[in-house]
């Protein structure tokens, strides 16, 4: 009985995991509150993973009522480490797949997307945006999360990569 109890306690304690996810967000939204812009990585768990896409979505969108965003520019400009890239867009998609077009970005970058149109007809001219790498770190335990549904994952950190390195070294 004692061995079972020790095994059970060890299982609960030793199965805790920490999940770290990386992504890019604009430093400032420049007052644009109708759309959300972010950039996703090929592998969000790898700090050095290149950017796969830039996504633009309508903040009104939800599962029951999706709203589309149409990129009006045929291409966008991306500046990374003083290199300038011109990337083609797909007017039928709110995503700009930059990695598929041979652009490899692993650091902070700037982009000019231009104009987008919401499905209601509203046109928004997005100013040049500076993207910074962000980190989201959470702790979870599959065993205790299952037993106690009210005590799910715990956010440990959410911020830029520079803030994360400073937090990690404390």
Question: What are these model-derived regions, one by one?
Answer:
Residues 19, 168-170:
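Short, solvent-exposed mixed-charge patches
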Residues 121-167:
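Short beta-strand elements
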Residues 14-34:
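Bacterial Sec signal peptide processing site at the extreme N-terminus
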Residues 38-76:
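Short, surface-exposed binding/anchoring microloops in extracellular/periplasmic proteins
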Residues 1-20:
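Sec-dependent bacterial lipoprotein signal peptides
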Residues 7-10, 39, 55, 114:
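Small side chains
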Residues 50-51, 82-139:
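Short, solvent-exposed, Trp/other aromatic-anchored flexible loops in extracytoplasmic proteins
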